[in-house]
């Protein structure tokens, strides 16, 4: 029977190796939005301890096309009735987050959020751009699923590993509050993307990540966890960029990502003691991948990398501060509501 320490060490190595391999493959294959594939691979490696069967992988690709394609249905409404369209997007985000926290598939919920925000925002400006984003997401998912399968084949869980204990179910009232909070976190980035979807697409991905992280964050720790993980991700992206500048090639890109991934994976799986939840380290690594991926693309396009990074990091911080404010205000409102209605079911702070 393998020890818990051995299982965690194997999973940390698998997460770091898979994420690094997917990042290098995504840029090596010149995918249209290269940071999407490693983000999906990171999410799947952190969420699943078993590889997806072949049929399930194809089914997931079909689900991605259907769920992201749902954003295309909102484009005419956003064109002709923008206020109604925005409110409908907000309602759909609430329902999707509620579905994800009620026991639904977390990957499907993520794809639906992306479809409602990225696809509809891109299509509101240019329908062809929305189709390109869908194609990019499908390609990124296929690459991520392939890399995840290779990672599980190279580094499977030790024989005899016990399945994880199921998380306790939340009450319906608590799920609704958490879903409302997550939807309000995502909405400002969606409104920004309606202005210029090509420029604000990374902000949408960051806000989706924050929305998911906010469901496991309390008002007491919101600033430390949400803002702290964003700042740590930005700092790691800067260190990664200068380290990569020493030897600029795809092989070193993979090795540096492997090193950074191992450092954070040790924290994520509790191999190195710390005071932060796994979501903090996962959000930090996701933020680093988004910022780093955009910087590499800016450099390849001949843009001013440092100015673009400063602007993007500033927007990330603003979005994170807004998320912290939403967590704090909604938690305070919920506490006042429970205090004024003592017969209502009490719930711990979100």
Question: Positions of the model-derived regions?
Answer:
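Alpha-helical transmembrane segments and their membrane-interface boundaries
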Residues: 1-108, 121-258, 266-350
